[in-house]
Amino acid sequence: MWRAGSMSAELGVGCALRAVNERVQQAVALRPRDLPAIQPRLVAVSKTKPADMVIEAYGHGQRTFGENYVQELLEKASNPKILSLGPEIKWHFIGHLQKQNVNKLMAVPNLFVLETVDSVKLAGKVNSSWQKKGSPERLKVMVQINTSGEESKHGLPPSETIAIVEHINAKCPNLEFVGLMTIGSFGHDLSQGPNPDFQLLLSLREELCKKLNIPADQVELSMGMSVDFQHAIEVGSTNVRIGSMIFGERDYSKKPAPDKCAADVKAPLEVAQEH
């Protein structure tokens, strides 16, 4: 049986990247013409992988990378070799962010997008912390939506989407809202039709743009991982998060301690549902 990580293991990072990018373009060609013409961004998720693999992918043209844990991201982004050999690198944080880890995340070199804002309080904390950093640029943020309604997943209920975006735009001058993010239902059978989670995120963007008078091409959709990224792109994703197909299977015995406290019961999902 084909496995997501086998491509990288057999071909190496460079060949795996080329193969993934080819599949991205194949999916783009199948998108409906009425969708915003945004070239999908490939976020190479390097969690549990060494800095040398990030540098190798960078050497093959990859510039955007993602991490799930604040400590691991801070260590990699601060790595002298990555800083020296990857000056154009852009980091996306794609994991659950607890408020006590916000200041640490804001210290990450070359932090480009925070994809997982899931509350007004978190948005306020990030806004204040980024202001204290004194960056001349606003921090790009996405709002994470729990489109499936599963208790094991983080994210806002769909009904709260417009309210939090209004809050960010009106009350968080140091943040730039750039899109919506979701994790699709694991194991969705495409023979039954498109993933309803992806369709819901599309409809939320349409509603958001209509009510707040925002052009659709200014609201990205981050959805799709190694197992479903082509389908996600076909229905409108502009940002896919892919790890094992590029870097190979993960060894969780070497994974840094996750950014969680005893009360954070949702973190194990990341092991079951792979990027």
Swiss-Prot record:
Q: Which SUPFAM superfamilies match?
A: PLP-binding barrel
Where on the chain is N6-succinyllysine found, per UniProt?
Answer: 125
Q: Where are the annotated coiled coils located?
A: none
Phosphoserine: residues bearing it: 6, 226, 244
User: Where are the Phosphotyrosine residues found in this chain?
Assistant: 69
Where, per the database record, does this protein carry N6-(pyridoxal phosphate)lysine? 47
Q: Which Pfam families match?
A: Ala_racemase_N
Highest taxon of source: Eukaryota
Question: GO molecular function terms here?
Answer: pyridoxal phosphate binding
Q: Which CDD domains match?
A: PLPDE_III_YBL036c_euk
Which UniProt keyword terms apply here? Phosphoprotein, Pyridoxal phosphate
> Which NCBIfam families did the record assign?
YggS family pyridoxal phosphate-dependent enzyme
Protein's job: Pyridoxal 5'-phosphate (PLP)-binding protein, which may be involved in intracellular homeostatic regulation of pyridoxal 5'-phosphate (PLP), the active form of vitamin B6.
Name the family the entry cites: Belongs to the pyridoxal phosphate-binding protein YggS/PROSC family.
- HAMAP family of this UniProt entry? PLP_homeostasis
- Entry-linked PANTHER family: PROLINE SYNTHETASE CO-TRANSCRIBED BACTERIAL HOMOLOG PROTEIN, PYRIDOXAL PHOSPHATE HOMEOSTASIS PROTEIN
Query: What name appears for this protein in its UniProt entry?
Result: Pyridoxal phosphate homeostasis protein
Species for this entry: Pongo abelii (Sumatran orangutan)
Q: What is the lineage of its organism?
A: Eukaryota, Metazoa, Chordata, Craniata, Vertebrata
